[in-house]
Amino acid sequence: MITEAVTRQVEELGWYHTLELPDGQVTKGMFDLRDQMHRYGLPERMDGMRALDVGTWDGFWAFEMEKRGAEVIALDLDDERDLDWPPRRRPKVFPDTPRGAGFRLAKELFGSKVERVNLSIYNATPEEIGQFDFVFCGSVLIHLRDQLLALERIAGLCRGTFVSAEEYDPLSSIVPFPVSRYFADRDSAVVYWLPGIRTWRRMMWTAGFDRVEQTGKFRVKARDGWSVRHVGHRCTKDPAAS
């Protein structure tokens, strides 16, 4: 039962994801992905799977994978200082409160068993967190200084399927070879490199995935009305090459 105090807490938190909580309360997230889930390529059922959500934020995808039957690890960072800030965009003052308040509240309300691990994808290894049958990463890689290293780490963690959904650059996608545009000098969202579609595909192959399938292109709409182009990929490795 959600109390009045919890209702106020939900309303006061800043949410990245729109989550439908027990008793029908809905968080005011920057992105409402509920009607877009079919575009991302999660299996209908994930019973018996061990799944990883890279860059979980409020946990929308982690909780969804758990609902579908998976045992889920959710990866994110607690301290704003540990994020990949471009030097000229780095805040002079950081909040004292740890990130992940929305995730922790939602986990409690859902009665979830998802484990949130405070760890950079750069440092995530099988020795640290094990391997996974299914790895999901959505709208995270574009915010990283070293996208290829992150993909290499994901490939090392994945013993099954990796599903990616990331923003892409339409101009770079026209060029007949893999390129990315540099964005870290812009006074906008924290983005270092915006790859073309071909670039994403080649990076995933370079990182260790033998089969990289483009699953679709779509737009993700924000609460304020603007939208972001995304491209989806499904990646697997050849067992014989492992």
Q: Positions of the model-derived regions?
A:
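Class I SAM-dependent methyltransferase SAM/SAH-binding core
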Residues: 60-124
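Conserved class I S-adenosyl-L-methionine
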Residues: 49-57, 73, 163-186
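Conserved alpha-helix/loop element of class I SAM-dependent methyltransferases that forms part
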Residues: 26-49
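A short glycine-rich, Lys/Arg-flanked "PGG" loop and its adjoining helix->strand segment in the class I
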Residues: 148-161, 168
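Conserved S-adenosyl-L-methionine
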Residues: 209-220
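Short alpha-helix
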Residues: 99-106, 191-208
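A short SAM/SAH-binding and catalytic strip from SAM-dependent methyltransferases
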Residues: 133-146
